[in-house]
């Protein structure tokens, strides 16, 4: 860690503590050259994989896009917003757990469908109808039948 006062490279950690909910570490450091003390905060950087669309275009994972798609399916449904946020967190964890740098939109869509199936069956059908591009009533009926199994 470079000293913010003299830019020296040699610093030592005097004290380390967890901050808040334990997701951050506060470190008290001292420069070995100028002896000034300063504080740093460290957090884990959780990198999300890039998303590869069906046409081959690659784009950064967009949590807002994920949330808006789920909320559109859940519109006017009796689902707690905390449950939605937990589902989004779980989906993000599953994507990070793949260890891949890139994931297909199909995988993201399937994770969303799994989450919606647990949250609200009507929202699941709404999302599936758009995601799977249902063409007629028969396809709706088949999906509903699978849901009841």
From Swiss-Prot:
Swiss-Prot/TrEMBL cofactor(s): Zn(2+)
Where do the ATP-cone domain residues begin and end?
49-139
> Which GO molecular function terms does the record list?
ATP binding; DNA binding; zinc ion binding
Physiological role = Negatively regulates transcription of bacterial ribonucleotide reductase nrd genes and operons by binding to NrdR-boxes.
Short name of one Pfam family: Zn_ribbon_NrdR
**Cell cycle recorded as keyword:** no
Q: Which InterPro entries match?
A: ATP-cone_dom (IPR005144), NrdR-like_N (IPR055173), RNR_NrdR-like (IPR003796)
Q: Which PROSITE patterns match?
A: ATP_CONE (PS51161)
Query: Which PANTHER family does the record cross-reference, listed alphabetically?
Result: TRANSCRIPTIONAL REPRESSOR NRDR
What is the protein's given name? Transcriptional repressor NrdR
One biological process term from GO is: negative regulation of DNA-templated transcription
Give the cofactor note text. Binds 1 zinc ion.
Q: Which residue numbers delimit the unnamed Zn fingers?
A: 3-34
Q: Which family does it belong to?
A: Belongs to the NrdR family.
